[in-house]
Regions:
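Intrinsically disordered, low-complexity basic segments at termini and long loops, enriched
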Residues: 1-90, 101
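Structural signature for extended repeat/solenoid scaffolds and their inter-repeat hinge/linker regions
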Residues: 90-428
Length: 428
């Protein structure tokens, strides 16, 4: 499309081309919010929900600004190269918002969400030497380890590990394991794994031995994108010589197994910004018919819709469902299911509504009351520190009236506390 190279590409964009016979009628069609049979894509019709419209005619193009389910259509350009007496191509440039709070899996996280940004003047060799000296001889300088590893990005830590091996002939992770212990060791080792390998390790540990930590599996599978899950599966097979899906099937059963496998297969359309209001209404009616309307529950209907629809679509489904059932989808799930299946379904809903709120809740309840769920605390701080931890911290304060740092200070101690606080950073 002409002139497109000059446009700044700050957000994720998609070009959608429509074919129309009469170029004079299409603005009115858009203004009336009704899809026209004349406006078609090669693969499907485009349906638009009720929304706000603003039309500004121009000699060269018509600008239409409206928001629907996270996508912003900013302009419609007539393509003069393909125009003819019978047909005009109309191209829509669709720009997705940078900070989408609800449709979590299309959010492009800004730098302000990252709490660990690494060293701007990074050199792995002196860092490796500092770590070697901190662990050489009798005793360990834990603070030196904290100062280096919590203030470097994961990519920088991998370079430090390579330099450590090259300079001293030792594996850094194994050396750290031999010098550290307890929760502090667990946190530092978590920092040393590449992100997908770390999450693969968490899944492996959740299933090995007697018993299964279903909550860990649910958290990871429900909150990651399709591409992230594919990378985790790849890392899992490389590190443990086993297929993640097969291991989940072997370690779980019933409807919990089905929803976990469905989530792992990544059937959700992460990229779709379109909502078909008719399909959303039908899904809401199907969910109502599968639960509140009948005696018993059609669990597979819930699983199919929750695990295969995009987040933007599900948000519309939840709205329609509440109108039909006079109660939220969360309340219906609580009344229709129980145990780990209930937890899995509710997690999908929470992640769909607001991913940052979900992680804030996980961190809060990891520290609330007697004892600390250190695995949950470590996993979520480490895995989100280079993605959106600052945004999670903001949501944490809104939800609970206290900062994440203050709760960590109250609930942890020693080197473990200091390392966590370094990763979290200031959230006053």
């Amino acid at each position: 499309m002409k002139g497109e190279e000059q446009r700044p590409r700050e957000e994720s964009q998609r070009i959608v081309c429509l074919r129309k016979r009469d170029e004079k009628e299409w603005p009115a069609c858009w203004a009336s919010q009704k899809p026209s049979p004349a406006l078609q894509r090669e693969d499907r019709m485009i349906h638009f929900p009720s929304t706000q419209w603003k039309i500004s005619p121009n000699a060269n193009h018509t600008t239409v600004g409206f928001l629907f389910s996270g996508a912003l259509v900013i302009d419609h350009h007539k393509n003069p190269e393909s125009a003819s007496k019978e047909e005009t191509n109309v191209c829509l440039r669709i720009k997705r918002p940078r900070a989408r709070k609800e449709a979590w899996h299309r959010t492009e996280v800004e730098q302000e969400g990252v709490s660990v940004k690494g060293s701007p003047h990074f050199n792995p060799d002196p860092d490796a030497e500092t770590l070697y000296k901190a662990m050489k001889g009798i005793g360990t300088n834990e603070q030196a380890i904290i100062d280096v590893l919590t203030k470097r990005s994961n990519a920088q830590r991998q370079q430090i590990a390579k330099s450590f091996k090259a300079q001293f002939g030792k594996d850094l992770i194994e050396t750290l394991k031999s010098e550290l212990s307890g929760k502090f060791e667990r946190l530092i080792i978590a920092l040393m794994y590449p992100p997908y390998r770390y999450e693969a390790k968490e899944l492996y540990d959740a299933m090995k031995g007697i018993g299964t930590k279903e909550g860990v599996i649910i958290e990871i599978l429900a909150s990651r994108t399709k591409n992230q899950l594919q990378e985790i599966m790849k890392a899992y097979e490389e590190d443990y010589g086993s297929n993640l899906e097969e291991d989940i099937k072997a370690d779980t059963s019933g409807y919990l197994e089905r929803i976990l496998v469905c989530l792992l297969q990544g059937s959700r359309d992460d990229l779709s910004g379109y909502v078909d209001p008719g399909l959303a209404l039908q899904d809401a009616q199907d969910l109502y018919a599968a639960g509140e309307k009948i005696c018993g529950t059609d669990e597979m209907k819930f699983i199919t819709i929750l695990c295969t629809r995009s987040a933007t679509h599900l948000l519309r489904v939840f709205e329609e469902y509440e109108k039909i059932a006079n109660k939220s989808i969360e309340d219906s799930i609580k009344s229709e299911t129980h145990g780990s299946l209930e937890e899995a379904m509710l997690t999908v809903v929470k992640c769909t509504r607001n991913l940052h709120s979900y992680f804030a809740e996980r961190l809060y309840f990891a520290m609330k009351g007697a004892g600390t769920l250190d695995g949950t605390l470590i996993r979520n701080i480490v895995s989100r520190s280079e993605i959106d931890l600052n945004l999670i911290k903001n949501q944490f304060k809104k939800m609970y009236g206290k900062t994440l740092s203050s709760m960590i200070m109250e609930d942890t101690s020693g080197d473990y506390k200091n390392a966590l606080l370094n990763l979290v950073g200031s959230d006053l």
